[in-house]
Design a protein with these regions (language model features):
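Conserved alpha/beta core segments of nucleic-acid transaction machinery
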Residues: 352, 358-360
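Hydrophobic, well-ordered secondary-structure elements that form the walls
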Residues: 294, 342, 426
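DNA-contacting surface of Y-family translesion DNA polymerases
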Residues: 187, 195-338, 349-352, 493-494
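Short, hydrophobic beta-strand segments
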Residues: 102-108, 301, 305-308, 359
């Protein structure tokens, strides 16, 4: 039996825990600006039609009285760690798929004599006792049915008010199709808006109606991969098991900007900032990667990606940034860039083996860098490539980025020094010189308000009282979708 545990309205519920004055009020966490999106909201906000992934501007129109908060990723991560500790007390077979949800293989726990429903209720009690948060639990023989069951267990809300959910829903063996077939077809994994519209044109609105379509017809209409996938799910077939440790396939950062960027030099600087964040996360995870990918989304939402595979695995900002800026240089950005992303994939464990810093000319894989990266600094330290560290605001030190090639040994020593400084003094204590400004270093880190740029300070949370208002008016520089992808990149992320 597989169990799916999902914290209810996680980010918003944490905010209510941290500020009890928000209890009973519509609270929306996400990007507060025109290009922001809703990350989570309380059920009081859902009663007005607000939901996650909705544009923040629309959420504000639907529920103008809501408290809008930019979110505090670091605090959510703390609660997530405690949440997963509770789950591991039940079974070592825990597959975390987000900060607030996970799959559990509970076959071992069930052999101790309790039913899966009893185990689900105990899980909810322990999560609430440890975190003060509510969780919904679903159980079934397959992963996707367990997730559907947890969704069915959740509270619901409309203008009439919030109604508590069952808390625990178990789909017993033999009852799968009775549960599944009445559901709307959009409940299935893989049915996005475009596929949903296509299926509706064929008269398919429920999972049961989809199950009645021959697989060959689905393959002809949707393609072999999606057609077969949906046919299997419609008959409750899902062979995936709980993976206790999911392999990370890529590490990426991306950012949505409050205005479209058109200046190539400004975008090159942003590529350096994103590359520095990716490199730092790679090293902390003990990983290195061979393929560097950039993602560019223009103002009209057209999106392009470009990749280059290097001869060796890398984990340092200079080499990643140099590759990213070279890829960016081959794209016409003057039409305006809404979002920029940098990612590294084809990962390996252990130290990177960087024998060169992509000197001009063919790299070790035989590829030629089409243009040198922008001159954005030289390696820190007294070596031959630079005179030493560059002072940043507040007496901090800016290490450097990517202009001229440098010996691998020099970069390795510099990188180790940067990591030691950041471990002791924080991520913003040292970084690429090009990122230094009057306000200090603009480094990119995981959780830097991931849901869109902030609204202007005077409009971010008009009318929100107290501490909540102060947090909502906090300026948020950036938005990111950070993915440690357990498989192919999600939603186009590099």
């Amino acid at each position: 039996m597989i169990v799916h545990v999902d914290l209810d309205a996680f980010f918003a519920s944490v905010e209510v825990l941290l500020d009890p004055s928000l209890a009973g009020r519509p609270v929306i966490v996400g990007g507060t600006g025109a290009r922001g999106v809703v990350a989570a909201c309380t059920y009081e906000a859902r009663a007005f039609g607000v939901h996650s992934a909705m544009p923040s501007a629309r959420a504000r129109r639907l529920c103008p009285q809501a408290v809008f908060l930019p979110g505090r990723y670091d605090r959510y991560a703390e609660y997530s760690t405690r949440f997963h500790e509770v789950l591991h007390a039940y079974t070592p077979k825990v597959e975390g798929i987000a900060l607030d949800e996970a799959f559990l293989d509970v076959e071992g726990a069930l052999r101790r004599g309790r039913s899966v429903a009893e185990l689900g209720r105990a899980l909810r009690r322990d999560v609430h006792a440890e975190l003060g948060l509510d969780a919904s639990v679903g159980a079934a023989a397959t992963k996707f049915l367990a997730k559907l069951a947890s969704e069915a267990a959740k509270p619901t809300a409309d203008r009439a008010g919030t109604r508590p959910g069952a808390g625990v829903v178990v789909i017993e063996p033999g009852t799968e199709l009775a549960f599944l077939h009445p559901l709307p077809v959009r409940s299935l994994w893989g049915v996005g808006p475009a596929t949903h519209r296509r299926l509706e044109r064929f008269g398919v609105r429920t999972v049961g109606e989809l199950a009645a379509v021959p697989e060959a017809s689905l393959v002809a209409a949707l393609g072999p991969s999606l057609g077969h996938h949906l046919h299997e799910l419609a008959w409750a077939r899902d062979a995936r098991t709980v993976a206790a440790e999911r392999e990370i396939k890529s590490v990426s950062h991306e950012e949505t900007y409050a205005r479209d960027l058109r200046d190539p030099a400004e975008l090159a600087t942003e590529a350096v900032r994103l590359s520095d964040g990716v490199a730092s996360r790679l090293r902390r995870a003990g990983l290195a990667g061979r393929t560097v990918t950039i993602k560019v989304r223009f103002g009209d939402f057209t999106t392009v990606t470009r990749s280059r595979t290097l001869g060796e695995a890398v984990d340092t900002a200079p080499v990643i940034a140099r590759t990213a800026t070279a890829l960016l240089g081959a794209i016409d950005v003057t039409v305006g860039v809404r979002l920029l992303g940098v990612g590294v994939s084809k990962l390996t464990e252990g130290a990177a083996h960087q024998l060169s810093l992509l000197a001009d000319g063919p790299d070790r894989a035989g590829r030629t860098d089409p243009r040198p990266g922008p001159a954005v600094g030289r390696p820190s330290g007294p070596g031959p490539s630079g005179p030493g560290p560059t002072p940043a605001s507040g007496g901090r030190t800016a290490a450097n980025s990517v202009s001229a090639p440098a010996p691998a040994a020099a970069w390795g020593a510099a990188t180790e020094a940067v990591d030691r400084i950041r471990e002791r003094f924080g991520d913003r204590a040292v970084g690429p010189a090009v990122l230094a400004g009057a306000g200090g270093l603009r480094v990119k880190r995981r959780g830097d308000s991931p849901w869109g740029p902030a609204a202007p300070v005077e409009t971010a949370a008009a009318g929100d009282p107290g501490e909540a208002s102060g947090r909502a008016k906090t300026a948020v520089e950036s938005a990111e979708r950070v993915v440690d992808t357990p498989g192919s990149c999600e939603d186009g992320d590099p």
